[in-house]
From Swiss-Prot:
The keyword Nucleus does not apply. APOE is an apolipoprotein, a protein associating with lipid particles, that mainly functions in lipoprotein-mediated lipid transport between organs via the plasma and interstitial fluids. APOE is a core component of plasma lipoproteins and is involved in their production, conversion and clearance. Apolipoproteins are amphipathic molecules that interact both with lipids of the lipoprotein particle core and the aqueous environment of the plasma. Residues 157-167 are annotated as: LDL and other lipoprotein receptors binding. It comes from the Eukaryota. GO terms for molecular function: cholesterol transfer activity; heparan sulfate proteoglycan binding; heparin binding; identical protein binding; low-density lipoprotein particle receptor binding; phosphatidylcholine-sterol O-acyltransferase activator activity; phospholipid binding. Heparin binds at residues 161-164, 225-232. It is found in: Secreted; Secreted, Extracellular space; Secreted, Extracellular space, Extracellular matrix; Extracellular vesicle. This is Apolipoprotein E. Homotetramer. May interact with ABCA1; functionally associated with ABCA1 in the biogenesis of HDLs. May interact with APP/A4 amyloid-beta peptide; the interaction is extremely stable in vitro but its physiological significance is unclear. May interact with MAPT. May interact with MAP2. In the cerebrospinal fluid, interacts with secreted SORL1. Interacts with PMEL; this allows the loading of PMEL luminal fragment on ILVs to induce fibril nucleation. Residues 262-313 are annotated as: Homooligomerization.
Length: 313
């Protein structure tokens, strides 16, 4: 299969590199229908939009054509060109990712020729845009004079450019088809290689499964028992460690509570001492005043009792 692939690529590249002699073209009136472009890939559809837009410009009347060429046609063709080349590049990169391992020399040659075909297509589209821009400049230069000669020259140039564009687009299409075939073949080889590598592993897995199935129920039960016992012992150890950790935390809390109780007791005693130091002098002073008052009352009563008998005599 690999030999057929290499032969196909070499044959196609040799045919694409052959010199193509330009054929004389029949005179075609401006605006006459010319073949469209069809394809299913995104880049082919983008090129078809460029092709259809250029054909639509060709079918316009002279006055409308001149007005459009002076404003929007060049810009819209530029957008369509960029879109086409972007899709071509994306499709080529996608194929390069899918391309399997082939001969290094053949792969490099295919890639080089494909890039050259892509560059020729871009050059053809750029020539179309440049020719339309030149026609617009020449129309503006004649300042209202007859433009029949200019339109004739434009039609002749566009016929040649259309033919070259179609030829290079078909060339690129063929090369991408070859590239695509190589990518599919590479994918198939990759799947086969993976299958070959997985085969021994699958056989080994089936053999291991058979070995496990042949073990006695007692051996498997013993294995599960050992595993379960180890798990229970592990859980018991974890539980003991957790309980020890809780006990240590409770001891720390109790020590902190006792420490805080001692601090509160010391603070209460200090506060009591401060209260005593505040009120003790006041109490002593009140006691002295009370003793003096009692003494004065007693003295007054004694004086009153001695003076009363004297008055009776």
């Amino acid at each position: 299969m690999k030999v057929l692939w290499v032969a196909l690529v070499i044959t196609l590249l040799a045919g694409c590199q052959a010199e193509v002699e330009p054929e004389p073209e029949p005179e075609v009136q401006l605006g006459r229908e010319w073949p469209g472009w069809q394809g299913s890939q995104p880049w082919e559809q983008a090129l078809g939009r460029f092709w259809d837009y250029l054909r639509w410009v060709q079918t316009l009347s002279d006055q409308v054509q001149e007005e459009l060429l002076s404003t929007q046609v060049i810009q819209e063709l530029t957008v369509l060109m960029d879109e086409t080349m972007k899709e071509v590049k994306a499709y080529r990169e996608e194929l390069e990712e899918q391309l399997g391992p082939i001969a290094q020399e053949t792969q490099a040659r295919v890639s080089k020729e494909l890039q050259a075909a892509q560059a020729r297509l871009a050059s053809d589209m750029e020539d179309v845009r440049s020719r339309l821009a030149q026609y617009r400049s020449e129309v503006q230069a004649v300042m209202g004079q007859t433009t029949d000669e200019l339109r004739g020259r434009l039609a002749s140039h566009l016929r040649k450019l259309r033919k070259r564009l179609l030829r290079d687009a078909e060339d690129l299409q063929k090369r991408l088809a070859v590239y695509r075939a190589g990518a599919v073949e590479g994918s198939e080889r990759s799947v086969s290689a993976i299958r070959e590598r997985l085969g021994p592993l699958m056989e080994k897995g089936r053999g291991r499964a058979g070995t496990l199935a042949s073990q006695t129920l007692r051996e498997r039960a013993e294995a599960w028992h050992q595993k379960l016992r180890g798990r229970v012992e592990e859980m018991g150890t974890q539980a003991r460690d957790h309980l020890e950790e809780i006990r240590e935390q409770l001891e720390e809390v109790r020590a902190k509570v006792e420490e805080q109780g001692s601090q509160i007791r010391l603070q209460a005693e200090a506060f009591q001492a401060r209260l005593k130091s505040w009120f003790e002098p006041l109490v002593e002073d009140m006691q002295r005043q009370w003793a003096g008052l009692v003494e004065k009352v007693q003295l007054a009563m004694a004086t009153s009792s001695t003076s009363a008998p004297s008055e009776n005599h």
